[in-house]
Amino acid sequence: MKNILFVLYEDFHSNSALHVHHFANNLVELGLDCAVAVPRNKHTVSLVGENLTNLYQVTEYGEFYRLNECFKNQKGPDVVHVWTPREVTRNYCRKLRKAYDFQLVIHLEDNEEYVLEKYLNKPFSEIANANGSLNIPENVSHPQRYKEFLATANGVTVIIEKLKEFVPNNVPTLTLWPGVDTEHFSQRKPNPERAKQLGVPDDNIVFSYTGNVHAANTEEVKSLYLAVALLNREGQRTTLIRTGRDFENFLGDDDSWARQYAIELGYVDRSLMPEILALANVLVQPGKPDKFNDYRFPCKLPEFLAMGKPVVLPATNIGLEMENEKDALVLPAVDATHIVDSVTKLLQDKSLYKKLSDGSINFAKTHLSWQKNTKLLLSFYKEI
């Protein structure tokens, strides 16, 4: 085994691309040859950040007949690792099968059935029983074909243990956590020049949230804006610094109640993320246990934890692996009211604030190493 091809469902704008980037780079450093295939726009590899050089080759789906040129030995892939079982990646793999012989590994990072429900705004049972009468877009998983695709895999990696519920019993499975780039995401003092540049008022409580708004998380992100508005109404001047794009009108038509307290930066280069997170007093992952959150690993959480700030998160996904008031503040649900109460508590209790700051760093160092987790992945490749 020498050549590894990662297959992404989207170009490098996606959060998944960052995970693939680090796994591919670390596999190259372990002596393997890696390439990453995207549907189009391979030049977007530059979006992983100006500090992150890719050690792998990048190709587009349409170039699959000369895929061997991506590898030093001029041969095809030995392992194809698909991120994730959406129609666009499944169709690409069907074409690959006609030209190359390889071991297939599929990565799961979401409850694909719930994502499909939200995308089509219909219950999954209705979608699954539609007998082909519904048009399933390429950017989501097909209700039947994704299961058939998983059944053909030599192995499946899951980002969180609960996703194993969707994996056929006879398919080898690895729980594969992401890591965090501690060279760039690490504890530091807020940069006053950056705060001034962004227009952060002096002496305000600051939240930083780095993430897009899509159909599955509208209520969660709205709760963060609501918490900031409530804190301001109570006389605690608070600002939300937000990066990411809005794919939903989640605040309503009259959104001035929320946006007046927010500094919304849209898409920013990843090299700026550490300084943006460092401006925060507390880092909050809103949400609650449900069909969406139980099956995912929020991509921003490793970076939150590595920054050495107290982290507030719900008792689901990674929160179930953390000790409350040691690694983080783990709550049954993180909605607007709980956010207000938690932030007030942390800013008043300096001992707990310090304990959770240290705990977040320790958790990241222990569990969220790209190098360690890549070695687990390599061992899995060898076993299948």
Regions picked out by a protein language model, each given a short descriptive name:
Residues 338, 345, 352-367, 376-379:
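A short, well-ordered alpha-helix in the C-terminal region of glycosyltransferases
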